[in-house]
Regions:
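Terminal leader/tail segments of proteins
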Residues: 1-98
């Protein structure tokens, strides 16, 4: 039985797989990886909070674009300001994921 599964993320516009953006499924939860860097972690346990890497979560526009998809932020609410508000409200935790 596999304990880790890696899937390439798909473009929301075309539905085609995109290079260098991955979801990594583990027993503990799902990681979002952009290129070779872990950006975010969503635990399977609903009591656990979303964790973002404190150094890389907003590394580039592309990283943010796929981070929004990973955490299911709809197009109307996609802004760095909204994520910063969630961090300030302690709904998202910044930590070292790398």
């Amino acid at each position: 039985m596999k304990t880790i599964q890696v899937n390439q993320m798909c473009s929301p516009r075309t539905g085609n797989p995109v290079a260098n953006q991955f979801k990594i499924y583990t027993k503990k939860g799902v990681y979002f990886q952009s290129y070779s860097t872990i950006i975010a972690f969503k635990p399977h346990d609903f009591k656990g909070k979303l964790k973002l890497d404190e150094s890389y979560w907003d590394y580039s526009r592309t990283t943010l674009k796929y981070l929004y998809d990973f955490i299911n932020i709809n197009h109307r609410h996609r802004s760095k300001k909204n994520i910063l508000k969630l961090i300030q409200d302690k709904q998202i935790i910044l930590t070292n994921l790398n």
